[in-house]
From Swiss-Prot:
It comes from Rattus norvegicus (Rat). Catalyzes the transfer of a geranylgeranyl moiety from geranylgeranyl diphosphate to both cysteines of Rab proteins with the C-terminal sequence -XXCC, -XCXC and -CCXX, such as RAB1A, RAB3A, RAB5A and RAB7A. The lineage of its organism: Eukaryota, Metazoa, Chordata, Craniata, Vertebrata. Keywords: Acetylation, Metal-binding, Phosphoprotein, Prenyltransferase, Repeat, Transferase, Zinc. The modification Phosphothreonine is found at residue 3. This is Geranylgeranyl transferase type-2 subunit beta. Geranylgeranyl diphosphate binds at residues 190-192, 241-244.
Length: 331
């Protein structure tokens, strides 16, 4: 007998319409409660939190409700002498938060707020001889950081600052027999890493190196009877994988391989009808992270009330058109 499949049951009274205004109100009020326990405890990833909130507000056409000046001052104060950006004031710089900062500034058309040359030098300094990237000076290697590096430089128009060929070589060395990618060579395939690697290969024009049918099959197997998607076998579904899996499928031209209606129902069931926002699963606590990826997933599914989203950068397509960054996808 095989292992029993892990899944959730969606109740008959679960939300089935998009509560857009409630989500906008939830995000708009989130940053104003600066003495909340939840807000204080998320300081270590604040820069990414700001990116999640601003991006989802822009996708909903509500960016004007956020305090642009306060955010720009915050980002400027998080850039370090080395060029990298930290999650919050007084924290160490990291590639993850450097990308988030560049995404926010691109959203606001305010890249001048930081020293771009120093950002480029910082990204450059984190590339290793084998082409991989460390996330920071402490040296953890992960394909997520390869994506962060090329995404940051692509938005700045400085992709030629690194050894792109070696970077491609490293990412391809992380490809597995099932078509997926792990965090390092030999690591298990995981939907989050697959998103990073397919996004990386889209930015570097190397998607022809991917076996789209094999990878598409692995990604489609992430869909469970509830309609939700998990990140790897034997895991529960989670709204954030509505983004990582769906965006990867869009990048490799296989979005039509999953049951879109069942996924849409699962995402909508994860809304909180009282507070607004999305949770990882129906009935759980909402947060800005799952709210962005729920809304972005619905955008990829063609939700007309939401702006079209870039499957590579998780930013509004109109923003990327403005800065002329258009990675090629598999048609």
């Amino acid at each position: 007998m095989g292992t029993q499949q892990k899944d959730v049951t969606i109740k008959s009274d679960a939300p089935d319409t998009l509560l857009l205004e409630k989500h906008a109100d939830y995000i708009a009020s989130y940053g104003s409660k600066k003495d909340d326990y939840e807000y204080c405890m998320s300081e270590y990833l604040r820069m990414s939190g700001v990116y999640w909130g601003l991006t989802v507000m822009d996708l909903m056409g509500q960016l004007h409700r956020m305090n642009k000046e306060e955010i720009l001052v915050f980002i400027k104060s998080c850039q370090h002498e080395c060029g990298g950006v930290s999650a919050s004031i007084g924290h160490d710089p990291h590639l993850l938060y450097t990308l988030s900062a560049v995404q926010i500034l691109t959203l606001y058309d305010s890249i001048h707020v930081i020293n771009v040359d120093k950002v480029v030098a910082y990204v450059q300094s984190l590339q290793k001889e084998d082409g991989s990237f460390a996330g920071d000076i402490w040296g953890e290697i992960d394909t997520r950081f390869s994506f962060c590096a090329v995404a940051t430089l692509a938005l700045l128009g400085k992709l030629d600052a690194i050894n792109v060929e070696k970077a491609i070589e490293f990412v391809l060395s992380c490809m597995n027999f099932d078509g997926g990618f792990g965090c390092r060579p030999g690591s298990e395939s995981h939907a989050g890493q697959i998103y990073c690697c397919t996004g990386f290969l889209a930015i570097t024009s190397q998607l022809h190196q991917v076996n789209s049918d094999l990878l598409g099959w692995w990604l489609c197997e992430r869909q469970l009877p509830s309609g939700g998607l998990n990140g790897r076998p034997e895991k529960l579904p989670d709204v954030c994988y509505s983004w990582w899996v769906l965006a990867s499928l869009k990048i490799i031209g296989r979005l039509h391989w999953i049951d879109r209606e069942k996924l849409r129902s699962f995402i909508l069931a994860c809304q909180d009808e009282e507070t607004g926002g999305f949770a990882d699963r129906p009935g759980d606590m909402v947060d800005p992270f799952h709210t962005l990826f729920g809304i972005a997933g619905l955008s990829l599914l063609g939700e007309e009330q939401i702006k079209p989203v870039s499957p590579v950068f998780c930013m509004p397509e109109e923003v990327l058109q403005r800065v002329n960054v258009q990675p090629e996808l598999v048609s």
